[in-house]
Amino acid sequence: MARSKIALIGAGQIGGTLALLAGLKELGDVVLFDLVEGVPQGKALDLAELSPVAGFDAAFAGTGAYEQIAGADVVIVTAGVPRKPGMSRDDLLAVNLKVMEQAGAGIAKYAPDAFVICVTNPLDAMVWALQKASGLPRHKVVGMAGVLDSARLRYFLADEFNVSVEDVTAMVLGGHGDTMVPLMRYCTVAGIPVPDLIRIGWTSTDRIEAIVTRTRNGGAEIVELLKSGSAFYAPAASAIVMAESYLKDKKRVLPVAAPLSGEYGFRDLYVGVPAVIGARGVERIVELELDRAERAQFEQSVASVQGLVDACAKIAPDLVR
């Protein structure tokens, strides 16, 4: 049986890590695309030479031509300008919007049947623009955000309780930014909700609120530490989880930036919600019942996303025609 083909648009830190993880998980052959001559080719060769050591079979190719992504089963878009210290994800909007238009056109021409995962920031607006530019079905284009945000929250909670990360579950909704909505009612340790752990004295409300704040600032914390560039290991691993669920039809329930069609009371936006990812792409959205406070936070987050989408529409009006 022929191996799946995974195309990575952007061969930077995230793209290179994605290629490595795809190889290690034996998800398929990999094409690295980047406009910087030599970078995708060099990384592809390095990864190919790693495969005998790591013990996997996969073909790696580097290119600066979109035609080389032809027939890709999965396309993961990471291309764009990363954040620098002091910048928010929103500061990247105008320049990365142009990248999404170019990537969308390339995907539409050469990989129209692919499942597309957007990683580029500001995420919720960029995945919206990428779907508009590509014209692909909305359920075949998603954004990577909630998996990463929830993973950060899981790690912080595991550290707080001094337990294995494997026993911690977490759920983060809303936009991939300062207004994201961590839902503590749905965060558990071995099935025990965090609010119950507060009641039995394992932690305090103040400490949990500090963890929520740290989760919202998780990306910025890494940007400040690195000084140049942004997180790449965890974002790549998060996108690979989504790709694997699609390629293997695992039907995992993952928090992703998914297209809303009335769920949660919103339409025509990509917002972070739990969704089933399988061979048909976004197969179902899980619509949680939110209490009054959660609903207010979620609506604030959606309003932030809407503002970014409106800004995209003003910069590139052809996307909404």
UniProtKB/Swiss-Prot annotation:
UniProt enzyme class: oxidoreductase
Superkingdom: Bacteria
GO biological process: lactate metabolic process; tricarboxylic acid cycle
Positions with a binding annotation for substrate: R83, R89, N121, R152
Binding-site list for NAD(+): G10, A11, G12, Q13, I14, G15, D34, N96, V119, T120, N121
InterPro entries: L-lactate/malate_DH, Lactate/malate_DH_C, Lactate/malate_DH_N, Lactate_DH/Glyco_Ohase_4_C, Malate_DH_type3, NAD(P)-bd_dom_sf
SUPFAM superfamilies: LDH C-terminal domain-like, NAD(P)-binding Rossmann-fold domains
GO-annotated molecular function: L-lactate dehydrogenase activity; L-malate dehydrogenase (NAD+) activity
Catalytic site: H176
EC number(s) stated in the UniProt entry for this protein: 1.1.1.37
Catalytic reaction annotation: (S)-malate + NAD(+) = oxaloacetate + NADH + H(+)
Signal peptide positions (record): none
Annotated family: Belongs to the LDH/MDH superfamily. MDH type 3 family.
Protein name stated in the entry: Malate dehydrogenase
Species of provenance: Azorhizobium caulinodans (strain ATCC 43989 / DSM 5975 / JCM 20966 / LMG 6465 / NBRC 14845 / NCIMB 13405 / ORS 571)
